[in-house]
Amino acid sequence: KELYDIFFQMRLDHPEIFWAVGFSWKYYPDSPNLIFVPEYLFEKGKIKEHQTAMTSRVEKIARQAQGLSEWEKEKYVHDFICQNVHYDKLKKAYSHEIIGPLGQGVGVCEGIAKAVKVLLDALGVWCVIAICGNNPEKGIKYRHTWNIVRIGGAYYHLDATFDNTLGKSDKVEDIRYDYFN
């Protein structure tokens, strides 16, 4: 359980490590070591190729917001997601990672929150990923993921998924800000 918790938290803190989506482990009674065996989203040989593509994509997107204030950077990332990412109702595996929203233009809340974090990290804006669990007693069937950002020393919640899925439009004037700060 402890190894799972560490791996899970590492993936939230570093969503740029999008290719390792799980793990198994081996333990031999005669050895003091635990063997960690990562599970990959795609073939191990393709990791470097996808990593290079994602790094370039993040740099290209972030470059356009350099020199803006923290709030303007947050809004830029929010608007980019709302204009360029569609919610993946099929919930493909890559939609849970940055490669879905930033590479394929589709994502679920987890992938969208990870993409927001990676972009804000690249822009120097403090950001973490927040998760709420399901609660069948209150009718909440699924877990949800969003971001918490620090702008001007104050903390705000940012949910680009909900703003994205509430009113889908490609027009800048139609972007919703119901879950923006």
Regions of interest found by a model, annotated:
Residues 42-101:
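Secondary-structure boundary elements
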Residues 34-38, 100, 104-106, 154-160:
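Short, well-ordered strand-loop elements centered on a beta-strand within folded domains, enriched
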Residues 10, 81, 101-102, 180:
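A generic structural signal for nonpolar/aromatic side chains embedded in well-ordered alpha-helices
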Residues 111-181:
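Hydrophobic/aromatic-rich core segments of domains that either
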